[in-house]
């Protein structure tokens, strides 16, 4: 058993403006600021653990969405200043939607992100392996994990007699740099098994997703889908 005090608060503001023309077409501009604060104190007496962590993140974000005849194009970025990371993190994103008709649309998206070198919820729980408790600690000099993601999808809708149908096909790929991995560190002085979170070389996650739906008005609907996904390290960890 343990006792955790966890206080989180968030404050921010956002501006949204619609403009008749920005560069080449009508656009919606969005910008904002956000500040997050989290204070954590976790005590687990039975495992001789007393952990304190203060996380403060100041963020700014900007995006602009252009709307043209058959296209919607979005470009934006987010800037995060994290107190546990030396330099601010710049995270851009792009999105392009092509809609040639009311029944068909295609989308492609590229985005970036990161995970800070901090303790997460799963680190506060004692994992049991073979009846033995396992504690997770953070390595000295742990760097943030960065991600690059790209996805594309085709969404098709059609009416067949009295039935409405929809088919969505999506492909996705995410590459991770300085990926977080757990290394076995043996046992601590109290006999607890310890694993250390370190930076690995990299990893990737990719796959396809297919969803289909058929409905008869509001009377009945059937939806099926499946996902094929593969996750792997770029090098043996």
What spans do the regions from the language model cover?
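Outer-membrane beta-barrel translocator domains and adjoining extracellular loop/strand segments
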Residues: 1-2, 41-49, 85-91, 119-125, ...
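Outer-membrane beta-barrel strand-turn architecture
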Residues: 17-23, 65-70, 90, 98-102, ...
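Face-selective signature of the C-terminal outer-membrane beta-barrel domain
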Residues: 1-86, 165-171, 221-227
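Outer-membrane beta-barrel translocator/channel fold
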Residues: 104-157, 179
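Residue-level preference for beta-strand/loop junctions
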Residues: 5-7, 25, 54-56, 88, ...
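Hydrophobic, lipid-facing positions within transmembrane beta-strands of outer-membrane proteins
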Residues: 7-13, 56-62, 77, 90-96, ...
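Gram-negative outer-membrane beta-barrel transporters
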Residues: 67-72, 166-167, 171-175, 196-237
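Membrane-embedded beta-barrel scaffold of Gram-negative outer-membrane proteins
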Residues: 1, 99, 107, 141-198, ...
